[in-house]
Swiss-Prot record:
Entry protein name: Cobyric acid synthase
GO terms assigned for molecular function: ABC-type vitamin B12 transporter activity; catalytic activity
Pathway: Cofactor biosynthesis; adenosylcobalamin biosynthesis
Domain of life according to the entry: Bacteria
Name of the coding gene: cobQ
The keyword Repeat is annotated on this UniProt entry: no
Lineage: Bacteria, Pseudomonadati, Pseudomonadota, Betaproteobacteria, Burkholderiales
Pfam families: CbiA, GATase_3
Alphabetical list of PROSITE patterns matching this protein: GATASE_COBBQ
Role description: Catalyzes amidations at positions B, D, E, and G on adenosylcobyrinic A,C-diamide. NH(2) groups are provided by glutamine, and one molecule of ATP is hydrogenolyzed for each amidation.
């Protein structure tokens, strides 16, 4: 089991790289995260929902993603509550106190999934959540040491040296554990190191002498990886185009407080002719294309957009010929009205006017749509698209008579989304819109980029997984790492 001293220490990446290394040996290996809290999720082949990081790890392991890889997924709906997803299906919206009481039920689901994986694979590489040293969360823990103790699982502790204080993080984390939990820790991995490793040696020797635990490797800071993020938005809000000789498209996406599935934009951030910005505050940069992303709380995020002046900004952008895309929650915001009669996102009966840019209305519903989908753009040469739908809502109205996409359905094609009569606004429920090379190129050309290249994002992701595994093979003591898991 890989645990971390902090969130974003590198647990997900370490598990992905180890899965790829184990796959190279011919072993059948599965990733596993007992409990994940994230708004980036993926749809499995059997119609369930898991954390995006576990889908990436499954790709690294060469197996099909399924709900046992992440039996408990928590999707925050606000500062104090989350939607609880068990074995891929939404069960309830609970606040923190109610979820604490629900943990025994969640733990049963975790142990069921782990048992099935242990029976089906040669090895299971487990990822913890956050830190095992969160004292207030230790009672009834199912994500870190509580799980490790329950199944007698050895632990490797990873820490991020780039943020500073790595030795205090490691020693302090051990100090917060019980004697039996400390004994379970087999060693440390230090992540994101920059500089001369020889200068780190005195610190490593001190750490090993102080704790009696070995350092199993020091991983360098890897720039330019193209891998799906578990949850956090990139630290750098802006990505500049690598090529400016043939023209550049400027894209701006508002960093909504409850933004979900922002992995939709990874292909755009990697495109050599795209200037990409996540807008957080201050003046909004000039843009050719504005994209409203998915949201786990559409009504609250729409109010946030209005408070930030984006309703007027979008209308001005359209007057000057700009293009707008709304994806999932962003699609719902573009319509006339939104209604939440069942209290899916908050108080039952809440309603809000939408941005009024497309003639349809959305009603939020308790039933969640979870489906992988493929088809074509309904314009621009019928470029093929493939992605997935994750939403709780039904959208109806005249604008849907001019769909943005045609997706494969039972007995033929089914329409999805809307394209405005003037061709400036595109709305869709499909996540992963830009991941398919020719669809990405067609959409960038629609938005104004002449001769847009067909960037093969899946190939970039695969190359990053290979690079990750090569780096781990060079910088980890793999004999001791895999011995720790034996």
């Amino acid at each position: 089991m890989i645990q971390g001293t902090t969130s974003d220490a590198g647990k997900s990446t370490l598990v992905a790289g180890l899965c790829r290394l184990a796959r190279r040996t011919g072993a059948r290996v599965a990733p596993f995260k007992p409990q994940n809290m994230a708004l980036n999720s993926a749809v499995t082949a059997n119609g369930g929902e898991i954390g995006r990081a576990q889908a990436l790890q499954a790709l690294a392991a060469g197996i099909e993603a399924h709900t046992d890889l992440n039996p408990v997924l928590l999707k925050p709906t606000g500062d104090r509550g989350a939607q609880v997803i068990i074995h891929g299906k939404a069960r309830a919206n609970l606040d923190a106190r109610a979820y604490h009481d629900y943990k025994p039920t969640a733990m049963r689901a975790v142990l069921e999934s782990y048992g099935r994986l242990r029976g089906a694979y040669d090895a299971v590489i487990v990822e913890g959540a956050g830190s095992p040293a969160e004292i207030n969360l230790r009672e009834g823990d199912i994500a870190n040491m509580g799980f490790a103790e329950a199944v007698d699982c050895p632990v490797v502790l990873v820490a991020d040296i780039d943020r500073g204080g790595v030795f205090a993080h490691l020693v302090g984390t051990l100090a917060c554990l019980s004697d039996s939990e400390r004994a379970r820790v087999r060693g440390f991995v230090i992540n994101r190191f920059r500089g001369d490793p020889a200068l780190l040696e005195p610190g490593l020797r001190w750490l090993e002498a102080r704790t009696g635990k070995p350092v199993l490797g020091v991983l360098p800071y890897l720039h330019g990886l193209t891998l799906d993020a578990e949850d956090m938005l990139p630290a750098s809000a802006r990505t500049s185009a690598a090529r400016r000789d043939a023209g550049v498209l400027r894209i701006v996406v508002p960093a909504l407080p409850r933004i979900s599935n922002h992995t939709d934009f990874d292909a755009l951030r990697a495109h050599p002719r795209v200037d990409f910005t996540y807008w957080r505050r201050g003046p909004v940069p000039d843009a050719d294309l504005l994209i409203l992303p998915g949201s786990k709380n559409v009504l609250a995020d729409l109010a946030w957009l209005r408070d930030a002046g984006w309703d007027a900004l979008i209308k001005r952008h359209l007057r000057y010929g700009g293009k707008v895309i709304g994806i999932c929650g962003g699609m719902q915001m573009l319509g006339r009205t939104l209604a939440d009669p069942h209290g899916v996102e908050g108080a039952a009966g809440a309603t809000s006017a939408g941005l009024g840019l497309l003639d349809y209305a959305t009603t939020l519903t308790p039933e969640k749509t979870l489906v992988n989908a493929a088809g074509r753009l309904a314009f621009g040469g019928d470029a093929r698209v493939a992605g997935y739908e994750i939403h709780m809502g039904r959208t109806e109205g005249p604008a849907l008579a001019s769909p943005a996409l045609m997706l494969a359905g039972r007995g033929g094609e089914r329409p999805d989304g809307a394209l405005s009569a003037d061709g400036q606004i595109l709305a869709t429920y499909l996540h992963g819109l830009f991941d398919t090379p020719h669809a990405c190129a067609a959409l960038l050309e629609w938005a104004g980029l002449d001769g847009a290249e067909a960037l093969d994002y899946p190939a970039l992701r695969e190359a990053s997984l290979e690079r990750l595994a090569d780096t781990f093979a060079e910088h980890l003591d793999l004999d001791r790492v895999f011995a720790a898991f034996a």
